[in-house]
Amino acid sequence: MKMRKLFAGIAAAATLLGGMALGAASAQADGAATTAGSGTTVTGSAKFKFTAQDAKQLTNRELNAYKIADYVQYGTGNDATYGVQTAGTVTDQSGIKAALEAAVAGTNKTVPTDGGDLMAWALAEGVLDTTESSKDTATGAWKNGASRKFVETLKTRINMLGDPTVVDLGKNLAKDGLSATVTLPAGLYLFVDADYSAGTNKDATPSIAILVGSGNVENGVLNPLAEATVDIKNQTTAVTKKVNGKDAITASVGQKVTYTITSKVPQNTQYYSDYGYTYTDTPSVGQTVDFDSLKVTVADKALTKDTDYTVAKNEDGTFTVTISSIQKQTAGALITVTYAAKVTEAGASGSKAVTNAVVLSDNGAEATDSTTITNSGFSFTKTDAQGNPLAGATFTIRVPGVDGSFTATSDKTGTVTFKGLADGTYEVNETTVPNGFQQSLKAKFNVIIENGEVKFNGTDVWGLAPKESSDKYQVKNVKNVSQLPLTGAAGTTLFTVVALLVAGAGVAVALKSRQRVH
């Protein structure tokens, strides 16, 4: 009866942990065997296959394998059966005892103190079968069931388990990178990520500790040397950053933009004594961050600054947002960090583009994303009717999203330049005409910027701004109406003005004639 319960407990633990496949007997175990009480210890080797959803989970990944139990064969041939006993490499039984006490806490079981083998008792009594202590059997490896309590407690006492065997998963990858297979002596192992406390592997987070046994059970027969398969219990990290909802935008000087950073609360943070989760943001020159606007939400619920998260400005111009409450948040929930910034760079293109990168450090694993802001401008030349450059002409444009207007004045070469403009259509209005020129005749025209390319869109009503767009676009001032163009819309306007003047003169003469008659 005890033996049947032993294997039932082993099989249940195997189901729970996704890799501990043990059970009833087979006489097919090869390799040498040493005497263990009335049985012999199985010393043959077995393979352990670790699988992952993403190759990064296994890349550069090392695990420390602590053997905590041996298989023991009782009998020979077709009558052979198997049990377990604490591994001879364990140096201090009190570590396993403490782990078992954590596992049975709240149950009617008591860890024996009579000197018997603790691992044999644990599996015989079904201690690692969480169906007796937790209803969460489907995902027990990630939850706080009996087996997980056992593993998490034992992980803190690995100094009592003897020297581990280091297995390098990164050097034993399958061609697709989604599995890694290593060979170890048959038995039950606690696998602890070598990077667990340091958190320096940038490819993926450290794995939580895993309890895995070699072998499998088929038709009630145990083969302790069969390959065991287990999912690595870590995850890759991802982060997304947008500016105004996009990867790249154009924005004018003085325009406010909104940055949004998103990621998800990682799994299994509860199994770490300290879990680091930090965004390091690197805004380039050409923008001013509004730190008062920075907000953090998890699942659309606002977090409290200095309680749930902290913000630190660094001397190199970067700043960090640390989610200090990450272990209290719901796994898989969306984390959103938002803040505003004002664009200050008027020549944001090429090497001067305004960039903003974020690096998410998820307990050592890293992910990064970035955004880009560009802007451009346009120039034209102010001339007189003969094409000579004019200084002192002032023009203004209205810029969406920016208070006030942009103003530019022609220099001694007649050049007028507007910088730091987002893509869009701008109406250019002449507001100041140089002295000596007709003050009532002012130019007005449109400029279209698209993907940084500039197109001038004339002609204005006076013909001062030409219709054709070119790199040498010239806008004129005239001293009198006779210098206005005599063709096109401008010519029509001129003749209309002249006609009105003539008509006005005719009316005046007629009125004077009537006055003489009367």
Residues covered by each model-derived region:
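Solvent-exposed loop/turn and edge beta-strand elements of beta-rich ligand-binding domains
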Residues: 2-518
